[in-house]
């Protein structure tokens, strides 16, 4: 017997019982995006490796440890995308979408990072990202955050997520802060773990993200990034906070929030939860006004965010069990008796024409009425349409409400209208 081939560790199959809730959540997200005027862009999952090295930063964990990089048959270095922003910017530059234009874009799809798989963190994971180009004021930053807050309300999880904000200022302000932070860390080098010692010179702001309790205690006395901000960044952040307060969106300023990718400036934010254990970040983003120019385009202000769908699904299931997947089937067509199958299939096609959007499944594989009604129940159907030999002969069908048990004989020409009333 041949040996079974299994999925790669950290790259999961999502089976029909799971994808139904994903589809409902994704549909909710897309409806909100449409209400804000955002347009979908579809991007390759493989890009040239230098794109990510240049965009994300060569001394980040993503580039150093986590990327799936390989050489193709032409000798080119390619990488499975670890995030979506770099590819979106590349596409915008390549297709002339960005210079002197406003763009509000979103994308959805799989990303890849070689991490230790655990609940809410996988090697293949799915993100929905939004990117806005050509707008530099705090109002668009606020709109993106308002959009995410509307998602949480639609999904019934608002009480379980908290917004954290910070401003990391301009490149020059961060350079000044970097020098002060390195000087502080050098004075306390003996209290740093090996990872922080390495980061201290390559990417010192990442030390602020350390989960080591001793390092966190040390950082209580470290210089604060907010003290080094340039005046424009201060004004931008104050404007953002004022807009969020006007919109009734609560937030906490987290001076240690810096984000893990090098391209950010000014606004950074995260929506976090206490309901998923250690994997607390649900959605995160910020400004990256220098990235378009860094990747070969003309200077273009930009802001965006990404959200991990695996974590979002886990959170919705954990805190809002009333948010159910849509039923697989609305109507189940039961047929029993000689020569009823062709009549049943013809009626099913007519109903699909007359009731667009309604999910109708026809029984196949035979079985008596009891077995067929059991199948209807298994698929979650609300209504059964029954054809037996007498119904075929009379040009009628029996429509049965599977919740109340009530049933009515209806002329086949009137079945669609009757179903429309039953299904609302």
Swiss-Prot record:
GO molecular function per UniProt: ATP binding; histidine-tRNA ligase activity
Domain of life: Bacteria
EC numbers on record: 6.1.1.21
Record keywords, A-Z: Aminoacyl-tRNA synthetase, ATP-binding, Cytoplasm, Ligase, Nucleotide-binding, Protein biosynthesis
Catalytically driven reaction(s): tRNA(His) + L-histidine + ATP = L-histidyl-tRNA(His) + AMP + diphosphate + H(+)
Location(s), subcellular: Cytoplasm
Entries under PROSITE patterns matching the protein: AA_TRNA_LIGASE_II (PS50862)
Any one Gene Ontology BP term: histidyl-tRNA aminoacylation
Gene Ontology cellular component list: cytoplasm
Disulfide links within the chain: none
Broad class of where this protein is predominantly found: cytoplasm
Alphabetical list of InterPro entries matching this protein: aa-tRNA-synth_II, aa-tRNA-synth_II/BPL/LPL, Anticodon-bd, Anticodon-bd_dom_sf, His-tRNA-ligase, HisRS-like_core, HisRS/HisZ, HisRS_anticodon
Record flagged with keyword DNA-binding: no
Subunit and interaction comment: Homodimer.
Assigned protein family: Belongs to the class-II aminoacyl-tRNA synthetase family.
Official protein name in the record: Histidine--tRNA ligase
């Amino acid at each position: 017997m041949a040996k079974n081939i299994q999925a790669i560790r950290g790259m999961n199959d999502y089976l029909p019982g799971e994808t139904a809730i994903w589809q409902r959540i994704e549909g909710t997200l897309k409806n909100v995006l449409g209400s804000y005027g955002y347009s979908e862009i579809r991007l390759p999952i493989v890009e040239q490796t230098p794109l990510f090295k240049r965009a994300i930063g060569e001394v980040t964990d993503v580039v150093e440890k986590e990327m799936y990089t390989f050489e193709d048959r032409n000798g080119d270095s390619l990488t499975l995308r670890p995030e979506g922003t770099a590819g979106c910017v590349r596409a915008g530059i390549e297709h002339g979408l960005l210079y002197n234009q406003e763009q509000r874009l979103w994308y959805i799809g799989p990303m890849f990072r070689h991490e230790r798989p655990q609940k809410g963190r996988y090697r293949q994971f799915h993100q929905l990202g939004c990117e806005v180009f050509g707008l530099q004021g705090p109002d668009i930053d606020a709109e993106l955050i308002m959009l995410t807050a509307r998602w949480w309300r639609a999904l019934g999880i608002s009480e379980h997520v908290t917004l954290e904000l910070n401003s990391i200022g301009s490149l020059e302000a961060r350079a000044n802060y970097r020098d002060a932070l390195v000087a502080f860390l050098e004075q306390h080098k003996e209290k740093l773990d090996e990872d922080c010692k390495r980061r201290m010179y390559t990417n010192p702001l990442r030390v602020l993200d350390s989960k080591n309790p001793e390092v966190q205690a040390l950082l209580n006395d470290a210089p604060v990034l907010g003290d080094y901000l340039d005046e424009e960044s201060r004004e931008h952040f104050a404007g953002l906070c004022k807009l969020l307060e006007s919109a009734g969106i609560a937030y906490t300023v987290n001076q240690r929030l810096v984000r893990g990718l090098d391209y950010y400036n000014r606004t950074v934010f995260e929506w976090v939860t206490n309901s998923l254990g250690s994997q607390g970040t649900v959605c995160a983003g910020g400004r990256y006004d220098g990235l378009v120019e860094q990747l070969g385009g003309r200077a273009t202000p930009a802001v965006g965010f990404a959200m991990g769908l695996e974590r979002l699904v886990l959170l919705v299931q954990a805190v809002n069990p009333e948010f159910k997947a849509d039923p697989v089937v609305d109507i189940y067509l039961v047929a029993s008796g000689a020569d009823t199958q062709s009549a049943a299939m013809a009626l099913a096609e007519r109903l699909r024409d007359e009731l667009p959007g309604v999910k109708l499944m026809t029984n196949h594989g035979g079985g008596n009425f009891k077995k067929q009604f059991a199948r209807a129940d298994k698929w979650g159907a609300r209504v059964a349409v029954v054809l037996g030999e007498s119904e075929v002969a009379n040009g009628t069908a029996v429509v049965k409400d599977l919740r109340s048990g009530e049933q009515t004989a209806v002329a086949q020409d009137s079945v669609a209208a009757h179903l429309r009333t039953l299904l609302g």
